[in-house]
Amino acid sequence: MRLTSGIFHAAIAVAAVGAVLPEGPSSSKTHRNEYARRMLGSSFGIPKNQTFDYLVIGGGTAGLTIATRLAEQGVGSVAVIEAGGFYELNNGNLSQIPAQDAFYVGTDLDDWQPGIDWGFHTTPQAGAYDRVSHYARGKCLGGSSARNYMAYQRGTKAAHQRWADTVGDSSYTWEQFLPFFEKSLHFTPANDALRGANASVVSDPSVLGNGDGPLSVTYPHYAQAFATWAKHAFIEIGLQIRSGFQSGALLGQSYGLYTINATTMHRESSETSFLRKGLADPNLTVFQSALAKRIRFQDKRAVGVDVETMGRAYTLSARKEIVLSAGAFQSPQLLMVSGVGPAATLKAHNIPLVADRPGVGQNMQDHIIYAPSYRVNVITQSALLNEEFEAQANRDYNERAAGIYANPTSDILAWEKIPEPKRSAWFSNHTRQVLAEYPDDWPEVEFLTMGGYFGYQRNYIRDNPSDGYNYASLAVSLCTPRSRGNVTITSPDAGVPPVINPNWLTDPVDVELAVAAFKRTRDFFNTTAIKPILIGPEYFPGSQVATDAEILDHVRKSFDTIFHASCTCAMGLANDTQAVVDSKARVIGVEALRVVDASALPFLPPGHPQSTLYALAEKIACEISGNC
């Protein structure tokens, strides 16, 4: 799209943060005077040796949440160490506009943007014919909440019971964890007048908090026409309409709730929500463009972090604790280069051993995604390639915070267990037995209606057909991943990228489910409800992909991750040698160090983990401060 006025507004918004800080008497907790508090720069650190009460490594989804809450809850001074900067400034407005969420996330190694992304790539993947893929990760304030697809939904009640059982802590049950979900939120109901016809939303606001949280969640001011037809097709194949996916149940379909600012329709991230709030607190300091290189220990107590900013090395020290929130790849990497991890790995790189934790970097879990695409006779995001349509969409977004740019491409989310009799026909006895181990409310497959073309997912923008047709897709994601990957290091230097091996689609259960899920998309497109809007047969991959072997071949060539890497510093019981943190997120075997991000999850819950990470950060902040 053309650059809208959004980037100018973003720059002004960032630059003006200091000007809107609350006035009042100077805090007794700080020596800053009131005039200094009104300057943006007062909230940001400069590269030199300093000491704070708490250090948070990583300014991403969980990192900015826990840092802001700790400062707010009066624990003392808090510093955030973030390698990136403001995505609004480093990526134009592409990171702000919901419809632009597919920029720089393809599997091609050159489909990345160094201003906001780490440029990580995987090892050759056996489950994808040895393909090496770019794995998008947010290198910016907001982290991957600035890069994701903005879906906000929660796991199931039984998944939370399994979490509580796995870590031996009842505070992770649905009933006890729900308040931490609610604490973050500022929910705004759907604006049906702007969404358009036949797109009304059924939701349950009773579980969406009291509205005083900083994180805006709402429904886009535009609904894709494809979705209005898709909901009837879902009903035809057995997926009934639910009142949203926030109440601990997922089986069925609903319009998705998204982390979008309800007024501007800009992306909402931990930076636009928690950090903007936190900058008003004189006890919060942010070090941007600051790469954490190593955690320092005295005996087994974490006491500081070696940091590098633009070639300058310095140390930030912690009086009380350090919270590691660098994500599923770099949290285990930082632990290992600091001496916490598998002893053999550390020895191979001459890293002094602080604690032998074999599970560091292991147990990686992730969700994959792929989709067939059809030509359709309704407007989708394909129409943005038409200059006249795009110009009107631009005006709608800038002038009314509405129109197709307000929509993040996906609309309806739906979950199911593969139903009978297809289940018995499609699955081996082994696969049926393994899937039976999951709770009754845990779905096996997620469907996402997508108003656009999917293809091989190498570069969504480059590969988008420009033939004048509108395209729509039904994406599928596997919710019971059995394949396990790992993360390791090749150097004691945290500046050297970690080795990332997701090991996708290598377990036979995942393989059978991947084929079955693709067949279910064809069930969907064969319904009488969806037929009226289809132009011709399946466009991608096409009817020549027919047998199970051909479907699997296609899936291996076309799938990508939906960027839910997790569990590489898994939570568990202290006597579990594969566990890295306990139920309070404390690293086992050392003191004054916690891990709070997706790497700390004991397993990957069904769906999109963003909501869980915000809630986990809220929970651990309360554990630390004791002031909730």
From Swiss-Prot:
Example GO molecular function term? polyketide synthase activity
UniProt keyword list: Cell wall, Cytoplasm, FAD, Flavoprotein, Glycoprotein, Oxidoreductase, Secreted, Signal, Vacuole
One of the GO BP terms on file? patulin biosynthetic process
Q: Which GO terms describe its cellular component?
A: cell cortex; extracellular matrix; extracellular region; vacuole
Which enzyme class?
A: oxidoreductase
Q: Has the keyword Nucleus been applied to this entry?
A: no
Location relative to the cell? Cytoplasm, Cell cortex; Vacuole; Secreted; Secreted, Cell wall
Residues with attached carbohydrate: N49, N93, N198, N261, N283, N429, N486, N526, N575
User: Is Calcium among the key words of this record?
Assistant: no
User: Per its Swiss-Prot or TrEMBL entry, what cofactor is needed?
Assistant: FAD
**What are the catalytic residues?**
H564 (proton acceptor)
| Enzyme Commission number(s) | 1.1.-.-
Induction and repression of expression: Expression is correlated with the production of patulin. Expression is positively regulated by the secondary metabolism regulator laeA. Expression is strongly decreased with increased sucrose concentrations. This decrease is lost in the presence of malic acid. Expression is increased with pH changes from 2.5 to 3.5 in the presence of a limiting concentration of sucrose, 50 mM. Natural phenols present in apple fruits such as chlorogenic acid or the flavonoid epicatechin modulate patulin biosynthesis.
* Disrupted gene: phenotype observed: Completely abolishes the production of patulin.
Pathway noted in the entry: Mycotoxin biosynthesis; patulin biosynthesis
Q: Where is the signal peptide?
A: 1-19
Q: Which reaction does it catalyse?
A: (E)-ascladiol + A = patulin + AH2
User: What is the entry's stated biotechnological use?
Assistant: Patulin was originally used as an antibiotic and specifically trialed to be used against the common cold, but it is no longer used for that purpose since it has been shown to induce immunological, neurological and gastrointestinal effects. Genotoxic effects of patulin with dose-dependent increase in DNA strand breaks in brain, liver and kidneys have been detected in mice. However, more recently, it has been proposed that patulin might also have anti-tumor properties.
Q: Give a short account of what the protein does.
A: Patulin synthase; part of the gene cluster that mediates the biosynthesis of patulin, an acetate-derived tetraketide mycotoxin produced by several fungal species that shows antimicrobial properties against several bacteria. PatE catalyzes the last step of the pathway which is the conversion of E-ascladiol to patulin. The pathway begins with the synthesis of 6-methylsalicylic acid by the polyketide synthase (PKS) patK via condensation of acetate and malonate units.
Describe the family membership recorded for this protein in Swiss-Prot or TrEMBL. Answer: Belongs to the GMC oxidoreductase family.
Name the UniProt record assigns to this protein: Patulin synthase
Origin organism is Penicillium expansum (Blue mold rot fungus)
